[in-house]
Amino acid sequence: MTQRIREAERELKYEEYAGREGDIVTGMIQQTDARYTLLDLGRVEALLPQSEQVMFERPEPNARLKAYIVEVRKTAKGPQIVVSRTHPGLVKRLFELEVPEIADGIVEIRACAREPGHRTKIAVYSNDSNVDPVGACVGARGARVRQVVTELRGEKIDIVPFSDDLPDFVMKALSPAKVKEVRIIEETGTAEVIVPDFQLSLAIGKEGQNARLAARLTGWRVDIKSESQLAQEEAYGDVDWAEGEWVVDPETGEQVWKPADGGDAISADDWTDQADDESLAETDAGDEANEAENASEEE
C-alpha cells in the first residue's frame, strides 16, 4: 500500500511538470557541485547542469533563482526537471513577466540572439500601430528592461524593432552602430554592410560580438566593411590578391582580409600597405611607358 501511494505521488508530481518545457520556474538553491546545482521548487527539485549555467554567475545557497525548463524526464524516483540559465528562451520569458503587452500578444519577440552573461539582442514587433514595441519593452525610464537585466546579473540587452525589409532589419540589428548602406547578396546569403570609418569598431563589437549577434538575429551572414575599405576594394577589384572578404579574427576580434585563393589572412594595415604598393607599381609602370613613348617620338 505504501509503495502504491509513493508511485501515485511521483505520478502526480510528474504530471504537474509534464509538458511545461519552455516555462520559467523559481527555486531556491540547495547545493552546488562541479556537475550541477540543485533548485528546490517546493514539491520537487530541478537540476541546473554546469553546461546550462552562465559562466560568470556564482550560485549562492538559499538564494532564489529563475530558470528555464528545457526537459522533464520521467524516472523511477519521480520527475527529473532539467533547467537552464543560458537558453535564449529565458530572456523571452522574463520579458513576458515584465511586459504586459507581450503577455497579451500585442507585442511579439520575433527573434532573439544571446551570448549568455555578455549580451542579448531581441527583435520586437507590435500588432498595434499605436504601441511602440521597443518602448513597451524598455518601460518608463527603463524600468522593465532593468528588471530583466537584474535577473540576468547585468547581462546587456539590445532591443531593436523587427522589420520585414531585410536591409532595414540588418541595419537595426547592428545597433548601436550607425550604418550607411546594406547590400543583400542572395547567392551567398550575405548582407554586405557599409559603415563610416569611425563606426567600424562599434559595428563589429568587442571580439566581433555585435556582428555575430546581428547575424544570428537576422539569420544572414553579415560582412561589415568601412567606407575606406570599400573604396579600396573597388579601386583594386581587378587585382588577384584583392579578391576575398573581410572577416573577424576569432582570437583578436580585429578585422582581417581573407584572400579568396585560400592564402594567409592579412591585417587591415597590411592590406592598405599592399594596396598602396600596387598603386605605386602601377604609377611607376605608367611613368616608364610614358618615358618610352616620348623617347620614341624624339627619335
Describe the function of each predicted region.
Residues 1-299:
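RNA-contacting regions in translation and RNA-metabolism proteins
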